[in-house]
Each structure stands twice: as structure tokens, then as C-alpha cells.
């Protein structure tokens, strides 16, 4: 039997406000336990929540970016459950009327574009956390994170592989950081993923029993957890068993999921309207302000890069993965006047070096103007491709040295003496009679071999295009 995996994601996006959703306490990460726990988070008697306007404004921007419906009237509900890190005994969330509904997000997997529908995004507060380390067997409660504003973004169960789920999560991560509503720091919990996974016989309309894998904080773990969970469910069903609805945890060391708790019913919580919070009405002025503050979105910018700079759609998607990357490319491409070569260098040599060194583009010793200067020297014939790679390495090691100084210092100037190049061509032709005969017989690959020999003789300083023209002229 052929099985189909069905995946839906619930992603908790921590909004990068300076204060919490219902109090003025700081949201700064890394403080001493409970340093940022106000009377609201501690649930002291008589305190009331006050809505943070910036949370609403950031939620509106996400709704606009997802081309979603934005509900102008917002009410809050109490999600009731007991846990030590939730002193109130309930979490303030949105149940029936989320601020964002019916959005969509495009993903690309294996070159194919697919649209994933976003069911909703609702505002809610985060809980605190339990601390077990260094307390001699006791458990401490840290409420610094409690009350931190979240947008829980819920997709439709439309992903059919771990690769699609990872692509969706990456696309949403890119979008919320692009909009500057979330810092995207997964290690600090700013972007946490819950994956709902089920399997069914391929072609069956009815969904299988789903299991929810909680708190995945890396794309690699998301991929591993989904693949393991899908295989585990298939094994249960093929052995004649029944998949029980459950909440799962992923063990990254073992690369496997395990049951945290069984769910007897899908509706675990008793919700009711929060009487302490008035409805939040989004005004026309707020909508207009949010629209005016919206940046050019990645999809729009990618289309413009294709039209204005002649880059491929694939390269444009890579270049618009972040605002930092897009701004870097546009600055370098404008300065050099060479869109496609700039994209090739960014997505090739520069990306590989940054990855090797474990660095971010913002910290690169090769700035956009320096890359533009390098690309310009290739365009005007000063550098060949091979010499340009050597120049790039020198530029990386010598961030204060100009491209002109590097070319002179390392003797990287491409040969301009036509007579000297012609003499090298004659020498190579004389020493490679077999390749010459193959080329004359119509073997184009032989030409590349001859050009390669000339480039080797010139130590990479000859112009490959000039060499090729000379060879063709001499063998015509």
C-alpha cells in the first residue's frame, strides 16, 4: 500500500515588541529569572491586563503580507488549563475571532511552486517556563517569558512531505523577519513550530489520526521529526494497530519522537470570553498606517530583480531571502551595472565563503561596494574569472585594501599583450596535435581542452574569450 503524509503546522511567532502584550514589563531575553515578571504575569489579586497597541499593528502587517482577511473587531478568550508556569490558570488567546484569517503563502520545493493556505493567525500571550537545573531536585518557575506577545500562525493541512513543511516554515520565518515583526531567533524561542502529522492510504479523502509534535526549534529538527513520525505511524498501521491521538516530543539526540501525553478528545481546553479585556477595534487610520509602513515584499522584489537586473527567478528568490541580502544585492548591482554577474558572485563564491566561515552577510569583509568593484573589473576585462577568484580571496583577507591595490599587489592583471598571448597559443597548438585534429574533425570539447592549456600556460592571466578567438582563427 502507498501511504500519503498529511502535515499542518502551528507556528508561534514571538513579536519583537519592547514590552509584553498586557503589561509594561520588558521582553528582553536573558535576564535573571523573574526580573521581568510584573504583577500582571504574577496574577496578583486585582490587577488587570492592558492591551499593547504595537502587537495589533504587527499582526495587521502579517495579515497584509499573507493577503489575508483582517478582522476589524478582536475579542480575547481565556484558554483554561493548570500548569505551574501559568499563575492565572489560563492563557489569554483568541478562539473564534482571530485577527487574521484566510491567508496564503507560496513555497518552492524542487523548483515547483505551491500555495499553502493559512487558516488563521491569532494574538496570545506566552507562558513562563519551569527550571529544573541547579535546584537540588526542586523545580523553579521563571516568569520572564510569561506575557510575551505571540502570533500563532496556523496552516491548513496541505503539506505532503517534510520538505514541503520545511519550505513553508522557512518562508514564514523569512516573511516575519522581513516585516521586522519578529527577530526570528529560533535558539531563543522566537519562532517555535508544532507539527501535526498523520498518514492515510494515497487517494483516501479522509484524514488519518494526527499526532502533534511540540516545540521544534530548528528546521533540521522539523524535517527529522516529521519523517520519523510518519514512518512510525505507517509501521503501526501496517502491523494492524491504531494510531492514538497524542502530543509528541522530539528527541534530537536519538532522532525520534515519543509520546508526551495522550489526547482522548481534540477539545482539551475550556474557553470562555475574557471579561477583563474590551474588544479591540481596528480603525481605518490604523489600517492605513500599517499599509503605508509595509515594505516591498519578497515576491514583489524578486519579480523586480528579474525585470530590472536580468537575474533568473531562482537567483531572485535566493537574493530576497532576507532584507539584508536584497539590499546588498541591489547596492552592488546598481554600482557595478552588472546584475546577473553580481547575483552569481553573491549566490556562489560569497555565500559559500560565508557558510564556511560561519558568518552572516552583514559581517562580511566584502561589502556591497567592494563586490561591485570586483565585478566591474571582470566586466572591463581587467580580471578573468580565475583571477577574480584569487582577488576575492585576497579581498576577504585584506578588508581595508582596494581592488586596484589588490590587483597590483598580487599581480592579478589580465594579460593585454596580444602578441604574448598569441605566442602561447602557437606553443600550445604545436604541442597538442591530437586535440587540434579532434577540433578540426568537429569535436568542440577539444577546443575547451586547448583553451585550458593556454590558460594554464598563462597562469590564468590570459583572457579566455581572446584565447578562444585566436585558436579558432588559427585553425580555420
Curated annotation (Swiss-Prot):
Keywords: ATP-binding, Ligase, Nucleotide-binding, Protein biosynthesis. It comes from Neisseria gonorrhoeae (strain ATCC 700825 / FA 1090). PANTHER family: GLUTAMYL-TRNA GLN AMIDOTRANSFERASE SUBUNIT B MITOCHONDRIAL AND PROKARYOTIC PET112-RELATED, GLUTAMYL-TRNA(GLN) AMIDOTRANSFERASE SUBUNIT B, MITOCHONDRIAL. GO terms for biological process: glutaminyl-tRNAGln biosynthesis via transamidation; translation. InterPro entries: Asn/Gln-tRNA_amidoTrfase_suB/E, Asn/Gln-tRNA_Trfase_suB/E_cat, Asn/Gln_amidotransferase, Asn/Gln_tRNA_amidoTrase-B-like, GatB, GatB_C_1, GatB_Yqey_C_2, Gln-tRNA_amidoTrfase_suB_CS. Heterotrimer of A, B and C subunits. It comes from the Bacteria. Belongs to the GatB/GatE family. GatB subfamily. It catalyses: L-glutamyl-tRNA(Gln) + L-glutamine + ATP + H2O = L-glutaminyl-tRNA(Gln) + L-glutamate + ADP + phosphate + H(+); L-aspartyl-tRNA(Asn) + L-glutamine + ATP + H2O = L-asparaginyl-tRNA(Asn) + L-glutamate + ADP + phosphate + 2 H(+). It is an enzyme of class 6 (ligase). Gene3D superfamilies: 1.10.10.410, GatB domain, N-terminal subdomain (1.10.150.380). The keyword Secreted does not apply. One of its GO terms (molecular function) is ATP binding. The lineage of its organism: Bacteria, Pseudomonadati, Pseudomonadota, Betaproteobacteria, Neisseriales. The keyword Ligase applies. Its EC number is 6.3.5.-. Transmembrane segments: none annotated. Allows the formation of correctly charged Asn-tRNA(Asn) or Gln-tRNA(Gln) through the transamidation of misacylated Asp-tRNA(Asn) or Glu-tRNA(Gln) in organisms which lack either or both of asparaginyl-tRNA or glutaminyl-tRNA synthetases. The reaction takes place in the presence of glutamine and ATP through an activated phospho-Asp-tRNA(Asn) or phospho-Glu-tRNA(Gln). This is Aspartyl/glutamyl-tRNA(Asn/Gln) amidotransferase subunit B.
Amino acid at each position: 500500500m502507498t501511504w500519503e503524509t498529511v502535515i499542518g503546522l502551528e507556528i508561534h511567532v514571538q513579536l519583537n515588541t519592547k514590552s509584553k502584550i498586557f503589561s509594561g514589563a520588558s521582553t528582553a531575553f536573558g535576564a535573571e529569572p523573574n526580573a521581568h515578571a510584573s504583577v500582571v504575569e504574577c496574577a496578583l489579586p486585582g490587577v488587570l491586563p492592558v492591551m499593547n497597541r504595537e502587537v495589533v499593528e504587527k499582526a495587521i502587517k502579517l495579515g497584509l503580507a499573507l493577503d489575508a482577511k483582517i478582522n476589524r473587531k478582536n475579542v480575547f478568550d481565556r484558554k483554561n488549563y493548570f500548569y505551574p508556569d501559568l499563575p492565572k490558570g489560563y492563557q489569554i488567546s483568541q478562539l473564534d475571532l482571530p485577527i487574521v484569517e484566510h491567508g496564503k503563502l507560496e513555497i518552492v520545493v524542487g523548483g515547483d511552486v505551491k500555495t499553502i493556505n493559512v487558516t488563521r493567525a491569532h494574538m496570545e500571550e506566552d507562558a513562563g517556563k519551569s527550571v529544573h537545573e541547579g535546584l537540588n531536585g526542586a523545580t523553579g518557575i521563571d516568569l520572564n517569558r510569561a506575557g510575551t506577545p505571540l502570533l500563532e500562525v496556523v496552516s491548513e493541512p496541505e503539506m505532503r512531505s517534510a520538505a514541503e513543511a520545511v519550505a513553508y516554515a522557512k518562508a514564514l520565518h523569512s516573511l516575519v523577519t522581513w516585516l521586522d515583526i519578529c527577530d526570528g531567533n529560533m535558539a531563543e524561542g522566537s519562532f517555535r513550530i508544532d507539527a501535526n502529522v498523520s498518514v492515510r492510504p494515497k487517494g483516501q479523502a479522509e484524514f488519518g489520526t494526527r499526532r502533534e509534535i511540540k516545540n521544534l526549534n530548528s528546521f533540521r529538527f522539523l524535517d527529522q521529526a516529521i519523517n520519523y513520525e510518519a514512518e512510525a505511524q505507517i509501521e503501526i498501521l501496517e502491523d494492524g494497530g491504531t494510531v492514538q491521538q497524542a502530543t509528541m516530543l522530539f528527541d534530537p539526540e536519538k532522532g525520534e519522537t515519543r509520546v508526551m501525553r495522550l489526547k482522548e478528545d481534540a477539545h482539551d481546553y475550556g474557553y470562555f470570553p475574557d471579561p477583563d479585556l474590551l474588544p479591540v477595534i481596528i480603525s481605518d487610520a490604523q489600517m492605513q498606517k500599517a499599509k503605508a509602513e509595509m515594505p516591498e515584499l519578497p515576491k514583489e522584489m524578486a519579480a523586480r530583480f528579474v525585470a530590472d537586473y536580468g537575474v533568473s527567478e531562482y537567483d531572485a528568490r535566493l537574493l530576497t531571502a532576507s532584507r539584508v541580502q536584497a539590499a546588498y544585492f541591489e547596492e552592488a548591482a546598481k554600482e557595478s551595472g552588472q546584475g546577473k554577474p553580481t547575483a552569481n558572485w553573491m549566490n556562489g563564491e560569497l555565500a559559500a565563503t560565508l557558510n564556511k566561515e560561519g558568518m552572516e552577510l552583514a559581517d562580511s569583509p566584502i561589502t556591497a561596494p567592494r563586490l561591485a568593484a570586483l565585478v566591474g573589473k571582470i566586466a572591463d576585462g581587467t580580471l578573468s574569472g580565475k583571477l577574480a577568484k584569487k582577488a576575492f580571496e585576497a579581498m576577504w583577507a585584506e578588508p581595508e585594501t582596494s581592488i586596484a591595490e589588490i590587483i597590483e599587489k598580487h599581480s592579478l592583471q589580465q594579460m593585454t599583450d596580444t602578441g604574448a598571448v598569441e605566442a602561447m597559443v602557437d606553443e600550445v597548438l604545436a604541442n597538442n596535435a591530437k586535440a587540434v585534429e579532434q577540433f578540426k574533425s568537429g569535436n568542440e570539447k577539444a577546443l575547451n581542452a586547448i583553451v585550458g592549456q593556454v590558460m594554464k600556460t598563462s597562469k590564468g592571466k590570459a583572457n579566455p574569450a581572446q584565447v578562444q578567438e585566436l585558436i579558432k582563427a588559427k585553425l580555420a
